[in-house]
Curated annotation (Swiss-Prot):
One of the GO biological process terms: adaptive immune response
Protein's UniProt name: T cell receptor beta variable 6-1
Domain of life: Eukaryota
InterPro entries: Ig-like_dom (IPR007110), Ig-like_dom_sf (IPR036179), Ig-like_fold (IPR013783), Ig_V-set (IPR013106), TCR_beta_variable (IPR050413)
């Protein structure tokens, strides 16, 4: 690879603009003791109507916890027990673990769609 090409690539990366995040979940990582509660926040910047919370346990596929077809409405998914949700506006959909249990150790995903 020539020096000219290498410098061009480095320069292009320095001037790259940020990309829209789409869906943002916070916090990214969390460890809880049994019985503790916490809220996972999800925000989307794509003006989508529908939002979803999923969990993925080791060796399993995604399982729907709750979903919302529009702001102010929520419906239970496949595994809603132990969770509550809130969708006060089009952009945000929060998931609350009321009392953490070892069975809730999982990877959590938020998604949105038209």
């Amino acid at each position: 690879m020539s020096i000219g090409l290498l410098c061009c690539v480095a320069f292009s990366l320095l001037w790259a603009s940020p990309v829209n995040a789409g869906v943002t979940q916070t916090p990214k990582f969390q460890v809880l003791k049994t019985g503790q509660s916490m809220t996972l926040q999800c925000a989307q910047d794509m003006n989508h109507n529908s939002m979803y919370w999923y969990r993925q346990d080791p060796g399993m596929g995604l399982r729907l916890i709750y979903y919302s077809a529009s702001e102010g409405t929520t419906d239970k998914g496949e595994v809603p027990n132990g969770y509550n949700v809130s969708r006060l506006n089009k952009r945000e959909f929060s998931l609350r673990l009321e009392s953490a249990a070892p069975s809730q150790t999982s990877v959590y995903f938020c998604a949105s769609s038209e």
